[in-house]
């Protein structure tokens, strides 16, 4: 069985969480792991009308047979971690989650610095979660590791070993990235970026998967890309236009209103190329065409929506295998068997 990596193709908030949640329930992976930066990314999913938002634990938590892992490359905030354990107690997360003992720790001093530093919080528009300062300490070899926090001892493991053992046994491993290509420290709109690279290759390294062991890379795009905070946004639309179209969203972590733009085909093609996309997922198609809401059969999509998907495939050069048509888990078109 393969390893599958899911990453964002825009500026985050593409709906990676909903894609990971669907794959978790439909494909039943034995392991669901989180790579990426840390608690500055909030992934949300709607289950039976109830919205769950997580910043630390993998979004596939509702797959109660899966082992949930947080890779060594991810920053861990113990306060957020234990809050989510309590929040998700109905899903028996506590007995299934593991943290790599090498994860760096976000401390209160990191959060305070992130929130009070005029450059980070004011100009760059960081989330204030402490990830940037914590990663800076990690680079300087000053950060604490998960193995140094007594309260985390029951959850410590070697994530890389667990994942590679699972792959050796033919198990399916699903890996969830954070943020999006436009926020990559290397390839994004520097300096308005996050504190590390978040492309598929880095997400694989975060959890200990070597390049030759990556089987599939799914890059997620939202029909109307959004961005929180400062930074270039070439296809941004006026807020009045976003209001008129009903495209009003707020960040999961910051609560700040998201800036909205038109789909950027040039960026999407470059993002898919650098990430090595084998397949695309498109979310919120119902926002592009309201008549697409809740459709689960590709052949039943209205013409406007179908032409948009076909244009993405043609201009990006990668097939679209998953299409979200609404907020609920079942609001999805799965074309993977036909592309």
Swiss-Prot record:
Its EC number is 6.3.4.4. The active site is at 13 (proton acceptor), 43 (proton donor). Keywords: Cytoplasm, GTP-binding, Ligase, Magnesium, Metal-binding, Nucleotide-binding, Purine biosynthesis. SMART domains: Adenylsucc_synt. The keyword 4Fe-4S does not apply. It catalyses: IMP + L-aspartate + GTP = N(6)-(1,2-dicarboxyethyl)-AMP + GDP + phosphate + 2 H(+). Binds 1 Mg(2+) ion per subunit. It holds the Pfam family Adenylsucc_synt. Substrate binds at residues 252-258. GO terms for cellular component: cytoplasm. Its cofactor is Mg(2+). Its main location: cytoplasm. CDD domains: AdSS (cd03108). IMP binds at residues 13-16, 40-43, 127, 141, 179, 194, 256. Plays an important role in the de novo pathway of purine nucleotide biosynthesis. Catalyzes the first committed step in the biosynthesis of AMP from IMP. PANTHER family: ADENYLOSUCCINATE SYNTHETASE. This is Adenylosuccinate synthetase. It comes from Pyrococcus horikoshii (strain ATCC 700860 / DSM 12428 / JCM 9974 / NBRC 100139 / OT-3).
